[in-house]
Structures are given as C-alpha cells and as structure tokens.
C-alpha cells in the first residue's frame, strides 16, 4: 500500500486494554447513584461509544439503554464516573502486545500517526504519557474535540484537510464497528483488530479492508511495498 501517508489509531481496545480501570469507575459510579454493581465482563461489552453511552449502559445493565433513565441521573453518574476514573490513575490498563514496537517502526518510517478516540479528551494525554507512546502522535483527537464522534468522519476529514491528503492516503486502525464505519464514511482504508471491544460481534462483520489479531501485521500492510 504505497499510497498510505497517515495512519489514524483508535485507543481503547486497539492500543490499550483500558477496561479494567473503566470497569472500576463505572461500577463505583453506578453504585454511588443507587444502581446495581457492574462487572468487568459487562463493561467489556458496553465500551466503544464514548463515556456517556458507557455509563447509560451500566445503569441499564444492558447494551440497550433504558429510556426511563432521566437526563439528570445520567449526567450525575457521568460526573461521578469521570471523578472515579481519574482516581484510578489508569494503573490497571496496559498496552496490547506489539503496540509500542509497531508505533516506533511506523514513526521511524516517516508515517504521520494520529490518535482518534471517542474517549473524553481530558483523560487522553495522561494515558498516552503513562504508557510511553505520546510522542508518536502528531494529532490527538478525543471524543469531545469535535461535535460528532466516530462513526461520523468529522475527525478523519479534519486530519485529511490539515495534512493536505486524499482519503486513499489514510488508514484507520481500530477494533470496533465505529472505527470501520468512520473510515468508510471518510472514504479511507480500514484495518480491523479482532481482540478489542466490539460488543461481542466479530470485527470482520463490519468489512474492514484488512483484519488481524496482531497490530504488528500493520507493518506488513503499509511497509511491504513502501
């Protein structure tokens, strides 16, 4: 794929297994507003659409959000979740295998690397610094950087415009349907990872251009013919 100049990465479920910390915070927030406890296994299914949706699903004990949850309750639980998540210090989260070496090789090869996550922006810099990968990214876009999150292509379109590239020069790497749909909506290539968070649905169902269980495979895709 000689055409690729810019590679955009999702964070949670793609580079970082952050569910252990998210689960602690979601459980504490749910119980703090008088709702049942939430397990790590549940949170693995609930992540991928931003913090507001995660908390609403946790309160609903379901992927389908209970329409009877009041906006006030959801806002209160979200505020508590943010506080608890900050207090975790992200100590339980860890990078997936081959992430750091893959980012290093891509960075050294001259690719522009960007981070496009639905995670609230305020948490992202600390997480990247803590895991020693912040310096690889020229752009870091959080879930509240723009009015619309993935699967909307707004962030990807902004990257294309900023770096003066065409859609076929960008590859989006992610673990969920939202990542693949964002890529399709922007007209760029997509690389789906099987190990992340996609609500129990195989990432192949979203029909990415490439599918792998190892982020290191990305090097073969973009460097083999470079």
Swiss-Prot record:
Q: For this chain's UniProt record, which GO biological process terms are given?
A: carbohydrate metabolic process; DNA repair; glycolate biosynthetic process
Biochemical pathway: Organic acid metabolism; glycolate biosynthesis; glycolate from 2-phosphoglycolate: step 1/1
Magnesium in keyword set: yes
Q: Which InterPro entries match?
A: HAD-like_hydrolase_sf (IPR050155), HAD-like_sf (IPR036412), HAD-SF_hydro_IA (IPR006439), HAD-SF_hydro_IIIA (IPR006549), HAD_2 (IPR041492), HAD_sf (IPR023214), PGP-like_dom2 (IPR023198), PGPase_prok (IPR037512)
Catalytic function, reaction form: 2-phosphoglycolate + H2O = glycolate + phosphate
One Pfam assignment:
HAD_2
Enzyme Commission (EC) number: 3.1.3.18
**Any GO MF annotation of the entry:** phosphoglycolate phosphatase activity
- Entry binding sites for Mg(2+): 10, 12, 175
CDD domains linked:
HAD_PGPase
Keywords carried by this UniProt record:
Carbohydrate metabolism, Hydrolase, Magnesium, Metal-binding
Task: Output the superkingdom of the source species.
Answer: Bacteria
| Cofactor(s) of this protein | Mg(2+)
Q: Where is the active site?
A: 10 (nucleophile)
GO cellular component term, pick one: cytosol
HAMAP family under this entry?
GPH_hydrolase_bact (MF_00495)
Q: What does this protein do?
A: Specifically catalyzes the dephosphorylation of 2-phosphoglycolate. Is involved in the dissimilation of the intracellular 2-phosphoglycolate formed during the DNA repair of 3'-phosphoglycolate ends, a major class of DNA lesions induced by oxidative stress.
Family membership noted in the UniProt record: Belongs to the HAD-like hydrolase superfamily. CbbY/CbbZ/Gph/YieH family.
Q: What is this protein called?
A: Phosphoglycolate phosphatase
* Annotated organism of origin: Vibrio cholerae serotype O1 (strain ATCC 39315 / El Tor Inaba N16961)
């Amino acid at each position: 794929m000689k055409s690729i100049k810019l590679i955009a990465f999702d964070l949670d479920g793609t580079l970082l297994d952050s569910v252990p910390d998210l689960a602690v915070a979601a459980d504490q927030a749910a119980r703090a507003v008088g709702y049942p406890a939430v397990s790590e296994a549940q949170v693995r299914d609930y992540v991928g659409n931003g913090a507001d949706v995660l908390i609403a699903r946790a309160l609903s004990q379901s992927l389908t959000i209970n329409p009877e949850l009041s906006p006030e309750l959801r806002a209160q639980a979200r505020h508590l979740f943010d506080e608890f998540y900050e207090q975790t210090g992200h100590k339980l989260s860890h990078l997936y295998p081959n992430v750091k070496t893959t980012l290093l090789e891509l960075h050294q090869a001259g690719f522009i690397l960007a981070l496009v996550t639905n995670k609230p922006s305020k948490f992202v810099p600390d997480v990247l610094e803590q895991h020693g990968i912040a310096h690889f990214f020229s752009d870091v876009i959080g879930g509240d950087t723009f009015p619309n999150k993935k699967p909307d292509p707004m962030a990807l379109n902004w990257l294309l415009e900023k770096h003066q590239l065409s859609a076929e020069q960008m590859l989006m790497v992610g673990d969920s349907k939202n990542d693949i749909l964002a890529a399709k909506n922007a007209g760029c290539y997509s690389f789906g990872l099987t190990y992340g968070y996609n609500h129990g649905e195989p990432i192949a169902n979203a029909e990415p251009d490439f599918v792998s269980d190892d982020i290191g495979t990305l090097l073969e895709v973009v460097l083999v013919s470079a």
